């Protein structure tokens, strides 16, 4: 498990992550809607975590930004791995203060390179209804058929 405090240091280790900003970020002088920016420092964390004051304030937009960030981060990470074969080990060492794991540095390095080189052409989405409860908290009620499809895709293999 890696906690959210790792976003900034790991983002900056890859030299920043290039994304197009698709939401308004009130109060930010660097995250400007419509601009392509290189996320550095706290801007990276703001981009992936902020919700309430950004765009429509709903979680769906934040999840879309997280997907955009994930794809761009993987590209930057993979590039760094190709430039420096020890880069995954450097990331592992940096993450020590932010993670709890039982995998070794060598295992992490192998997994990190696999993750970075994996094709992100398949995204699974559970459809459903968004709303708010009586206390004003955002809710999501998954469509049962959509949820079942995602479960089958993730956890089962088709027989041939």
Where on the chain are the PLM-derived regions?
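Structural recognition of the beta-strand scaffold that forms the well-ordered cores
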Residues: 1, 19, 46-47, 122-126
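A general secondary-structure junction signal
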Residues: 3, 23, 128-130
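Stable alpha-helical elements in mature extracytoplasmic
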Residues: 3-10, 44, 65-69, 73, ...
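Flexible, polar/acidic helix-loop-strand segments at domain edges
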Residues: 6-87
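Generic structural motif recognizing short loop/turn segments at the entrances and edges of beta-strands
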Residues: 15-17, 35, 41-44, 77, ...
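C-terminal solvent-exposed extensions
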Residues: 98-160
